[in-house]
Amino acid sequence: MEQVTKNVYAETKVRGCNPVYVVTSAGVVIIDTPQLPTYAVRMRKEAESHGQIKYLINTEHHVDHIFGNYYFRGAGIVVAHAETAANFKVVTPEINPYEYA
């Protein structure tokens, strides 16, 4: 992760989504998660080194934004549009996660 401002860190060298975490006085906010397991595990470890993860925000339903959520289980409240899960299931009803990892 690259530090882009004092409290904002982003994954800038991956194709697709650029996951971010923001360090606040109340805790850490994750914005989207990496789809690759190794990146997701590393992001969580780095983010937690700055404090407790309070929120995980998913900006959309595409796999490059949400697949890493699995590696953030129990790490704060997940925030997303009400249709995110429904859209994911409609667009990719029989997705093979190994095609994206």
Describe each region flagged by the PLM.
Residues 45-101:
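Active-site HxH/HxHxD metal-binding segment of metal-dependent hydrolases
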Residues 2-48:
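Conserved beta-strand hairpin/beta-sheet module of binuclear metal-dependent hydrolase folds
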